[in-house]
């Protein structure tokens, strides 16, 4: 007779002539290799790419460098270059506002010849003009100067406009240039600021 109750497992009654029934043996699953094991790295890559059209041809062997060595390599690669101080407090060539103004005015009139006002076109044209003017000003060879170029397009609708700029700078070396092009439907204004950078 079987005992049944709470917490007691029932087992089949065995007679002396019967052999005990064994539970079906389930095959043990193989342990998945860790990606941190050197030998298993290529196997993991192959498993991941098995269903794709790529085949793993070659895998670089894992490096044996310690983490501390990697950090040292990165620090040296990211270090800033240090240059010797020249102790020069003024530019070799002072900014010549008149020659730059002539060049900027020439670029402005050439670029805007026969152009009608269109706000969508002018948004891209202002960027192109600023780039062209910046390249032209850099060709003058003013070393240690940083340039800021502002290109403004104003549609003529019978309004009055006042454009003002304020700055704090060194009056001995810093300067600015303005060039204007007026058409039937708009006014174009270019401001070039040259700031000496020691």
From Swiss-Prot:
Gene3D superfamilies: Tctex-1. It is a peripheral membrane protein. Expressed predominantly in testis. Also expressed in brain, lung and trachea. Residues 1-34 are annotated as: Disordered. Residues 11-24 have a biased composition (Polar residues). Keywords: Cytoplasm, Cytoskeleton, Dynein, Membrane, Microtubule, Motor protein, Transport. It is found in: Cytoplasm, Cytoskeleton; Cytoplasmic granule; Membrane. One of its GO terms (biological process) is microtubule-based movement. GO terms for cellular component: cytoplasm; cytoplasmic dynein complex; membrane; microtubule. CDD domains: DLC-like_TCTEX1D3. Disulfide bonds: none annotated. The keyword Cell division does not apply. GO terms for molecular function: dynein intermediate chain binding. Interacts with CCDC159. Interacts with CSNK2B. May be an accessory component of axonemal dynein and cytoplasmic dynein 1. Candidate for involvement in male sterility. Belongs to the dynein light chain Tctex-type family. This is Dynein light chain Tctex-type protein 2. It comes from Homo sapiens. The lineage of its organism: Eukaryota, Metazoa, Chordata, Craniata, Vertebrata. The gene is DYNLT2.
């Amino acid at each position: 007779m079987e005992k049944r109750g709470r917490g007691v497992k029932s087992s089949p009654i065995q007679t002396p002539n019967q052999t005990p029934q064994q539970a079906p043996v389930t095959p043990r699953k193989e342990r998945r290799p860790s990606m941190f094991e050197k030998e298993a790295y290529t196997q993991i890559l192959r498993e991941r790419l098995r269903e794709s059209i790529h085949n793993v041809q070659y895998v670089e062997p894992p490096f044996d460098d310690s983490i501390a060595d990697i950090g040292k390599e990165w620090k040296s690669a990211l270090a800033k270059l240090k240059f010797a101080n020249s102790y020069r407090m003024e530019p070799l060539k002072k900014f010549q506002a008149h020659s730059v103004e002539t060049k900027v005015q020439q670029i402005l009139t050439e670029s805007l010849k026969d152009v009608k006002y269109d706000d969508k076109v002018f948004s891209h044209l202002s960027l192109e003009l600023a780039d062209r003017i910046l390249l032209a000003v850099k060709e003058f060879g003013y070393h240690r100067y940083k340039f800021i170029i502002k290109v403004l397009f104003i549609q003529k609708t019978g309004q009055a406009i006042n454009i003002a700029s304020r700055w704090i700078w060194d009056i001995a070396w810093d300067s600015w240039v303005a060039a204007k092009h007026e058409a039937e439907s708009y006014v174009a204004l270019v401001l070039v600021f040259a700031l000496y950078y020691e």
